[in-house]
Amino acid sequence: MAITKEDILNAVAEMSVMDVCDLVKMMEDKFGVSAAAAVAVAAGPVAGPAEAAEEKTEFDVVLVDAGSNKIAAIKAVRGATGLGLKEAKDAVEGTPFTVKEAASKEEAEVLKKQLEEAGAKVELK
């Protein structure tokens, strides 16, 4: 029995946002495509002065301050980056630290929310 599109859709629906982001990256690498490019093509060209005010699509998630609960911030950084305990601790203590570079808007917002829930101050650049 072959896996159907519906089976794949159901499996993705049960995944966390971070797992879905990882899956998208893996698919981009495997097939040599970019999900951001497909969205831009599907949206079509924008006419007039709106072209000059093009919305930023990639963001750097920067940890500005760990806040009062450094342990929670370290756990959040480890979860977001996959760093080891010592590396995450050094990153949190050596702020500002770029947690993720060139993240999509959605992924950047998710990371920002996770870090802020841990008590950290975060900027999207």
Swiss-Prot record:
Subunit relationships: Homodimer. Part of the ribosomal stalk of the 50S ribosomal subunit. Forms a multimeric L10(L12)X complex, where L10 forms an elongated spine to which 2 to 4 L12 dimers bind in a sequential fashion. Binds GTP-bound translation factors.
InterPro entries, per this entry?
Answer: Ribosomal_bL12 (IPR000206), Ribosomal_bL12_C (IPR013823), Ribosomal_bL12_C/ClpS-like (IPR014719), Ribosomal_bL12_oligo (IPR008932), Ribosomal_bL12_oligo_N_sf (IPR036235)
Q: Which family does it belong to?
A: Belongs to the bacterial ribosomal protein bL12 family.
Protein name, per record? Large ribosomal subunit protein bL12
SUPFAM superfamilies given for it?
ClpS-like (SSF54736), Ribosomal protein L7/12, oligomerisation (N-terminal) domain (SSF48300)
Q: Which UniProt keywords apply?
A: Ribonucleoprotein, Ribosomal protein
State the CDD domains in the record.
Ribosomal_L7_L12
Q: Which PANTHER family does the record associate with it?
A: 39S RIBOSOMAL PROTEIN L12, LARGE RIBOSOMAL SUBUNIT PROTEIN BL12M
Q: Function of this protein? A: Forms part of the ribosomal stalk which helps the ribosome interact with GTP-bound translation factors. Is thus essential for accurate translation.
Species assigned in the record: Francisella tularensis subsp. tularensis (strain SCHU S4 / Schu 4)
The entry lists its GO molecular-function terms as:
mRNA binding; structural constituent of ribosome
Keyword check for Ribosomal protein: yes
| Annotated Gene3D superfamilies | 3.30.1390.10, Single helix bin (1.20.5.710)
The lineage's top-level taxon is Bacteria
GO biological-process terms attached to the record: translation
Would the keyword Isomerase be found if you checked this record's keyword annotation? no
Which GO terms of the cellular component aspect does the record hold?
cytosolic large ribosomal subunit
